[in-house]
Every structure is written in C-alpha cells, then in structure tokens.
C-alpha cells in the first residue's frame, strides 16, 4: 500500500474577506497551463515561505495580490487540498470583514471582485469553496440571502 496521497508539496494560506451582506472577495485566476484552479474564481492566497507561520503567510499573500491589509484574521480551517492530477498541499483558511475603507486592487490574476452568495452559481468556483463560504457566513453570523 502506498501513501502517494500524503505527498504534500507545501503550505498555502488564503483569506475569505467578506462584507456584512455576505459577499466574498474572489480572484479570477489567470488562464495559464500548469496553474492550479486556472480560470476559476478563488479567494486570494498563496504559498508560505520557509518557516513562515500560516497567518503571516495569508496576510502577506493577500496584501501582495490585493493591496488590502487584513488586520484581524480569524482561523476557519486547515486541510489537505487534493485535486486529481495535482500534488496536494496543506491549505489554511482565515476570514475577516472588509472594512469598507481600504482600496482593493487586482495585482494578480485577471480580475477581483466581491461576489454575492446567491450569484455564486454564475461563476466557476470550486464546490468545496462554496461550502467553506457558507461555514464562514455562519461563523460571522451572517444570514445567506
């Protein structure tokens, strides 16, 4: 018996930035061959540097991709993200409320915008992220519209 599924190649941190109406900031990934979730809408995030803790990773990556600095990140979950045909990685997710003050810019990917939960089916979003979005809304005590 092999443990191929346990070959985790790295650690990734991401942030679910939500508005009080439950909309979530999502980034449209570039359409590049070899890019995981290419052409899909996902929350901003990225790989941890060596010896970097995951909350610092998520905050740094979010700033690098959006210019927005999340100052009150809260842990959601951590799990091994496995997609067929790709090496797996450890994904750690955090969330924060959008302060409605700082400007958000698209510094990576094709586009970035807040998507309303009831319109999520109009976008190519990985299904597991929809479940995590719903969990985050419960944690934040926001009712889905």
Range-by-range predicted roles:
Residues 1-25, 44:
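Conserved N-terminal beta-strand and adjoining loop/helix that marks the start
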Residues 7-8, 16, 32-34, 83, ...:
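Short secondary-structure boundary/capping segments
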Residues 102-108, 123-127:
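Short, charged, solvent-exposed linker or helix-capping segments at domain edges/interfaces
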Residues 23-64:
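Conserved Nudix-box catalytic region and its N-terminal flanking loop in Nudix hydrolases
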Residues 48, 120-121:
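A generic structural signal for short hydrophobic patches within well-formed alpha-helices
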Residues 69-78:
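A short coil-to-beta-strand element that immediately follows conserved catalytic motifs
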Residues 22, 79-103, 113, 117-119, ...:
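Active-site-adjacent beta-strand/loop module that shapes the phosphate/pyrophosphate-binding cleft
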